[in-house]
Amino acid sequence: MKKLLILPLALFLLVQSGLAQTPKWVEKAKRAVFSVITYDKNDKMLNTGNGFFVSEDGLALSDYSLFKGAERAVIVTAEGKQMPVSLILGADDMYDVIKFRVAITEKKVPSLVVATTAPATGADAWMLPYSTQKSIACVSGKVKDVSKIAGEYHYYTLSMQMKDKMVSCPVMNAEGQVFGISQKSSGADTVTTCYAAGAAFAMSQKISALSLGDVALKNIGIRKGLPEAEDQALVYLFMASTQMSADEYEKLLDDFIRQFPSSTDGYIRRANYYVAKGKDDQSYFDKAVADFNQALKVAAKKDDVYYNIAKLIYGYQLSKPETTYKDWTYDTALKNLRQAMAIDPLPVYTQLEGDILFAQQDYAGALAAYEKVNASNLASAASFFSAAKTKELLKADAKEVLALMDSCIARCPQPVTANFAPYLLERAQMYMNNDQARNAMLDYDAYYKAVNGQVNDLFYYYREQAALKARQYQRALDDIVKAVELSPKDLTYRAEHAVVNLRVGRYEESMKILNEILKDEPKYGEAYRLLGLCQIQLKKTDEACGNFNKAKELGDPNVDELIKKYCK
């Protein structure tokens, strides 16, 4: 009987000893630990695991594996309350950690303090499991080894037994601060040893400007947060605008404004987004106006906001809306722009002033603005091109227009690159309009080189016209053959091919081409006229006059003089 009493007494003393060693902070700290449930794209349960809060406003840590492939996630607190995971804020798939935000349903939640220093080898450690019961049960052990990861952070080997359901539970130091996130053991040492990634390392995970390309983050379908620094967040926004769906991008804009409420950039970008949506629903324009008004309220430099309002309205008018929204006219754009210029007359504002005046067909006013820009440090190929086109519309002397185009080309990278190559085409056309065909050919050749020969049939046709005018007949012939090759059904190219052959005295070849055209299109009047010209050269006047009369019947406007000359 005495032996039977001894065993329960020994067990009682052992339990009392264990309870005595449990730190006082455990009961409170355990309330910060929660269960995590993740769901896949079909809304089926994907994984379950643990995590814990590290701030009262819902910042939390767990393991990356739990979230991989998840489209949504919820947490269940120690009190049994469910809350959704709202944002992923950073992850590392190598060390299997993730930082995220929970959309908490209370003013604040119980949270743990992350230790700022690593515990020493041999220090006491406690692992806090998730539990919905009021219990101070925890697993105690020692820090067996501390190793460095990612420079200043740590990874821990613990002399501690751990069960599978305790992965991603917090590992605490004697002061009740979390220093590690428990990780699954493997191999022969699972009975006595487990591991923990540093909590400080998990906290260091963040979204950067380039995180849109991060494979680990892309494997999670839950929304991502923004970078903490505003400049990085702006780059992230810019990249997201072309990679996200419209709805996702709108939510991201909302997040940016919540995170940086005093930044005008968020309101301006969202206003531009709303205007794009306004093509289908004009109520979005009201939202854009509200955002611009808020931007003006928070702006330290209001001129930038006025400039962006002007630019947006100008772009809106350029799209030629069927009905104009309220007072969103070129005049309103100009009014906002001049408010910006009154605060700070920056050359970029003057450039937009010129563009708006140009759109209003006030070419004299536009030219005055462009000339101001060209005299400033903002002078560029684009500003000189704008001035050249405006002078051309004002019927200015061709030499003045070409001088401006020369300045435009001079401000392009040399040799001219593909992005600037269209300016060469513009100058080539101006040369052609002013009977400078050889100069036009040089620009066409420079364009061909700038775009690495990536040209179409129209380019070859234009260069052929220049070569023909410059009496470079072989080049003209080569280019028109190439144009026909690229677009064999185009009658203009085929007729031009006949013209070049006619010019170089290849009358039979020209007639062959023209007869093939008439086989495909019997009512093509120009072909009859050209056929007649070939026959005149071959002294076949009667046949030529028959073709001239056929061209006249079909409405060719250029045949009357030929009939007068050869057929009377």
Predicted regions and their residues:
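A conserved glycine-rich beta-strand in the N-terminal activation segment of trypsin-fold
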Residues: Q21-T22, Y39-D57, D63, Q82-P84, ...
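C-terminal cap/linker of serine protease catalytic domains
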Residues: T22-V26, V109, I181-L252
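Register position in tetratricopeptide repeats
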Residues: A276, G315-Y316, A359-Q360, L393-L394, ...
